[in-house]
Amino acid sequence: VHVFPVGIGRIGRDTPEMITKISQKRPNPTWTPPNSIREEYREKGIELPQVVPAGPENPLGDYALRLAYGAGDYLIHGTNKDFGIGLRVSSGCIRMEPKDIEWLFEQVQRGEQVTIINEPIKVSLEPDRSVFVEAHEPLTRSDGSKKLLQIPVELKWWLQDADIPSAKAKAVIFAQNGVPVEITPPMIEF
């Protein structure tokens, strides 16, 4: 599993949860703004071109992975600006740092499965038996209020069975900063 900071769809243009596949890999993509986005910009007094060619003005950056979900309208792509990663600012696509999308683009194949989830707490048991916990604010689709997260009962049971103090997991969950943190105590070698 690889973890990357991403930008996702803003409220009203949410990035949907999905299980899909990569339908297309496009280096140096062009961007054809959909009519809905063109209209949004027009209302702000900005006229978007019919097609934005590859290059420094293209908001998709240098790489795009088209997802097969729905009509294929969703992409995982780079960006041409140092803005939006870690935020809800896109029109539904998943925006990545240029170096991260370049790496991902080289690693994945057309037809590979992609799963988009919305889980505020994630737990990973690694092959070396280390455990990582990541927590972020739950995404809201309406009022923007924060929700106090609790340690899931399954994680509590696992922490007890593995004899791992829950204080570190609680701190990660309370912080809600989206950073995976190892919660297993260091191994003591004699």
What are these model-derived regions, one by one?
Residues 20, 29-32, 44-48:
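Soluble "head" domains of membrane/secretory-pathway proteins
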Residues 7-10, 28, 80-82:
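Short, solvent-exposed aromatic-acidic interface loops
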Residues 1-2, 15, 30-33, 141-144:
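Short, solvent-exposed loop/turn elements at domain surfaces
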Residues 36-190:
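Exported/periplasmic cell-wall-interacting domains
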Residues 13, 28, 119-123:
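Short, charged beta-turn/beta-strand-edge "cap" motif at the junction between a beta-strand
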Residues 1-24:
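Glycine-rich catalytic cores of cysteine/serine-nucleophile enzymes that process amide/ester linkages
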Residues 4-5, 32-33, 41-43:
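Secreted/periplasmic proteins
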